[in-house]
Curated annotation (Swiss-Prot):
Its main location: cytoplasm. Belongs to the tubulin family. This is Tubulin beta-6 chain. One of its GO terms (biological process) is microtubule cytoskeleton organization. The keyword GTP-binding applies. The keyword Cytoplasm applies. The gene is TUBB6. SUPFAM superfamilies: Tubulin C-terminal domain-like, Tubulin nucleotide-binding domain-like.
Length: 446
């Protein structure tokens, strides 16, 4: 079986992760003690992707939980599904990273990283054929960003041929938690560009907007936001866990979505987004799902896909529906909005269909798009970064942990390179591509 090892780090990562396990347990009919109480063989058929079966018939998540302070871990442990995790897989320090990337990456985090890697190794050895890792973290804090990227680079060294998927919560434009978020995020992106295979970009503000506008929640809590994220996370891997007509896995996803290795930051969306009360009154159709899924208001990060072009996209449908109809709808979207797709990648929308819908819905879909408009997010963070960095504001917190200003300069230029790469492919046309090839050929002849 193609197992996925789940790692959650920092306060944000642990809260998203806890919500995600609630959703996955529910889909597989596993109760908070790890016993199976479901009613369908399909739930058990590939339960191994995310669970290890213990000797007494209990299912234990393949999850590693880490943090540099015990607080969030305690609340996960006392939460609804706290008892299902393997107690040894909680790895935590006492000091906290204090929203300081350098503490997470170089000092406090570096002291804890070996015990985390031990647990990761143990879990990986329990796998039959490990497909890859999924990491939940935020990029604005200290632990999720600093220690999270440290762990990603260590895992990359040890398991170079396994997929590395991250769910990364970027700092929001208007909702700021700490003043040094731009520093932490830029230093993290510098790592993610090099070491991760696929990054699903999330952002609190976009999630707030969805809750507020679409779900009509007047005061959304982090619980509501995390619920949206976990629905998407579950959708990304549903093809691995349930039988379907068109399957996809992490590697197929990467092959279909990443035209150039550095451009692996995706926007995600989920449909149907209906408020909790009104769900049961509406039957959904594939066209409605498709329309909502491609809607800019549905994107879970603060970038507008209408300001850029899609290099590639992937749509994962769940529920009983005709594959033919799905294909027709996808072609339809591409024909109607052809200006929003780059013309030099033909057939750049992949779709997959999984037969089992999420709890409480007849059908649902998850959208993953590789759009050049994601550069808006990087641009925004970069501007905030530069505003502080050119005055060397708050730098002593980082240099005091042994960092060098050079690292900041490198991270900044790497992020700006990323932005210009996205811009370059946004502006590229098919004719230019041919022209460049001819030039290269002439150069080779000389």
């Amino acid at each position: 079986m193609r197992e996925i090892l789940h790692i959650q780090g920092g306060q944000c990562g642990n809260q998203i992760g806890a919500k995600f396990w609630e959703v996955v347990c529910d889909e597989h009919g596993i109760d908070p003690t790890g016993r199976y109480t479901g009613n369908s063989d399909l739930q058990l058929e590939r339960v191994n992707v995310y669970y290890n079966e213990a000797s007494c018939g209990r299912f234990v998540p393949r999850a590693v939980l880490m943090d540099l302070e015990p607080g969030t871990m305690d609340s996960v442990r006392t939460g609804p599904y706290g008892q299902i995790f393997r107690p040894d897989n909680f790895v935590f320090g006492q000091s906290g990273a204090g929203n300081n990337w350098a503490k997470g990456h170089y000092t406090e985090g570096a002291e804890l990283i070996d015990s985390v890697l031990d647990v990761v190794r143990k879990e990986a050895e329990n796998c039959d054929c490990l497909q890859g890792f999924q990491v939940c973290h935020s990029l604005g804090g200290g632990t999720g960003s600093g220690m999270g990227t440290l762990l990603i680079s260590k895992i990359r060294e040890e398991y170079p041929d396994r997929m590395m998927l991250t769910f990364s919560v970027f700092p929001s434009p208007k909702v700021s938690d700490t003043v040094v978020e731009p520093y932490n995020a830029t230093l993290s992106v510098h790592q993610l560009v090099e070491n991760a295979d696929e990054c699903m970009v999330l952002d609190n503000e976009a999630l707030y907007d969805i809750c507020f506008r679409t779900l009509k929640l007047t005061t959304p809590s982090f619980g509501d936001l995390n619920h949206l994220i976990s629905a998407t996370m579950s959708g990304v891997t549903c093809c691995l866990r349930f039988p379907g007509q068109l399957n996809s896995d992490l590697r197929k996803l990467a092959v279909n979505l990443i035209p150039f290795p550095r451009l692996h930051f995706f926007m995600v969306g989920f449909a149907p987004l209906t408020s909790r009360g009104s769900q049961q009154y509406r039957a959904l159709t594939v066209p409605e799902l498709t329309q909502q899924m491609w809607d800019a208001k549905n994107m879970m990060c603060a970038a507008d896909p209408r300001h850029g072009r899609y290099l590639t996209a992937s749509a994962m449908f769940r529920g009983k529906m005709s594959t033919k109809e799905v294909d027709e709808q996808m072609i339809n979207v591409q024909n109607k909005n052809s200006s929003y797709f780059v013309e030099w990648i033909p057939n750049n929308v992949k779709s997959s269909v999984c037969d089992i819908p999420p709890r409480g819905l007849s059908m649902a879909s998850t959208f993953i798009g590789n759009s050049t408009s994601i550069q808006e997010m990087f641009r925004r963070v970069s501007e905030q970064f530069t505003a502080m960095f050119r005055r060397k504001a708050f730098l002593h917190w980082y240099t005091g942990e042994g960092m060098d200003e050079m690292e900041f300069t490198e991270a900044e230029s790497n992020m700006n390179d990323l932005v210009s790469e996205y811009q370059q492919y946004q502006d590229a046309t098919a004719d230019e591509e041919e022209y460049e090839d001819e030039e290269e050929v002439q150069a080779d002849d000389m």
